[in-house]
Amino acid sequence: EQSETQQMPSGRLRISLPLVGPLVMPALTAFMLRYPAVELDVDFSDRMVDVIEEGFDVVMRTGEPTDSRLMSRPLGSYRLQLVASPDYLKRHGVPELPAELCHHACLHHRFPSTGRLEPWPLSCEPGAEELKLPTTMICNTSAALLDVATAGLGIACLPDFMVRQAVATGELLRVLDKYIDHQGTFRLLWPSSKYLSPKIRVFIDFMVGTLFAERESQKER
């Protein structure tokens, strides 16, 4: 659009973001303040959307890109952590080894796109049998698992950015940290095109420069 190239980026921008509001909302609101002429149409979902068929301009997802029709840029990394409330650990004890989780209430996340449970990234002894953890609760949104864990009802495996505040205030405690082997990456994906409109370009650049920069500054405080 000619008007877009001659002035501030404008127009409707359709984006899909995962259900990680505490991570993305500060950057998203800052983008809206910086580019008020860009109209955001936001879909919050953990499902694997078809970027092109569903008409999205940009989506944010984890993992490695698999669609050759899409371009991508990494946003930053995160780690999964096992957390529980002090009250829960006082009542049930602190697990010292991964195998001890079999005697605990375990709160699991189910991937909406596949229906599979998200594996807990526990490093066990070579040759050890795969742990069959109790499924005290299964939920397709991590936010609910955070609430249940904070209420003292079990141990949850959640991204570090979701539990950082609760850990800092003592509402949650990390367990089995030395047995966790995980690093995930968030990426922005958009349809491959010779022409990248200004509204898409500024959104990508803004999120790359802001999203995990905010997170790193919080870690340093």
Predicted regions and their residues:
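Short beta-strand-to-loop elements that line the ligand-binding cleft
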Residues: 40-44, 108, 130-141
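Hydrophobic residues within well-ordered alpha-helices
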Residues: 101, 147-152, 167, 188
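Short beta-strand->loop
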Residues: 72-75, 169-181
